[in-house]
């Protein structure tokens, strides 16, 4: 059984236990309960040390907070996987794959099939006896009903004779018109109910999108908080402007290193996934000549992407490091025509000035205010999405 069927089987087993009324949805307060039931199924027959967790402790805390904050948010069965991915940060399929590697779901499905066959065999004899008993009761009741039917028929004839001229028979035009009116009313109410359900579903999806946006703003807030803590730890009273600027560039370099580390981990995981299963790129029955056009472009594209990212980050870190070093050890030669206080720090250093003006003339992408604090702050905010 592949991973997709594992995930579908696990969701189909747990969902009816929580959605007891078969409404097709559960409330967000029951979302952690679904995950805990899934973990109980996956850990049946396992020792305490071998028990697997579908989500981490951090993910479990996120689910509890989501269930308490959005208590009556409707979670539909078809939206469960997308919501699980958005909250935990891991796809539901991958989470099930990491916990069901020992074939526990295969054994569970086989045992359910065997139990169903045995229950069917043991209950067939009892059902036959129950059917025979019910048939005998039906015969007795039928004989009694015949007598009741004759009495009811006689009473109906008497009532029909006593009814006035204004009475409407069952098949009269007035009765038919009333029936059609009621049917139209029922149809209208059903359409209105379907429309309201669709509106509620759409609002639920909008709320899900807003939840994702809140997560993005939370990431930006955490970045600003790290920046504040960094500056708070490196503050120095009455320090020169060059040292303050160097501290700012030092934080930029530390953030770039952190991003390089994260991207290196992602690239390493992608490389492991590509190299772990060579059979996916070279299917059996196909020669090496036929597999070459599919294998070579994929590796080439991955290498080009990795090289471009590393080259860009190395160039950016180098430029910012040169700026920081120039701010600390810039030339202090006396000013000639322009006062030193009016020159930028990179204009005061001969080597950096030549290098930066050379790249400006070559690419024509720098402006005259590239080294000023306002432009640096704007570029810095744009880089980190603040």
Swiss-Prot record:
Q: What keywords are annotated for this sequence in UniProt? A: Coiled coil, Cytoplasm, Cytoskeleton, Membrane, Nucleus, Transmembrane, Transmembrane helix
Q: Name one Pfam family in it.
A: MPS2
Query: Might you name a Gene Ontology BP term for this protein?
Result: spindle pole body duplication
Listed transmembrane segments = 296-315
| A GO-annotated cellular component | nuclear membrane
Chief subcellular location: nucleus
Q: Where in the cell is it found?
A: Nucleus membrane; Cytoplasm, Cytoskeleton, Microtubule organizing center, Spindle pole body
Annotated signal sequence is none
Q: Which residues form a coiled coil?
A: 117-232
Membrane topology, as annotated, equals: Single-pass membrane protein
Protein family (similarity comment): Belongs to the MPS2 family.
Q: What is the purpose of this protein?
A: Component of the spindle pole body (SPB) required for insertion of the nascent SPB into the nuclear envelope and for the proper execution of spindle pole body (SPB) duplication.
Name the chain's protein. Monopolar spindle protein 2
Provide the taxonomic classification. Eukaryota, Fungi, Dikarya, Ascomycota, Saccharomycotina
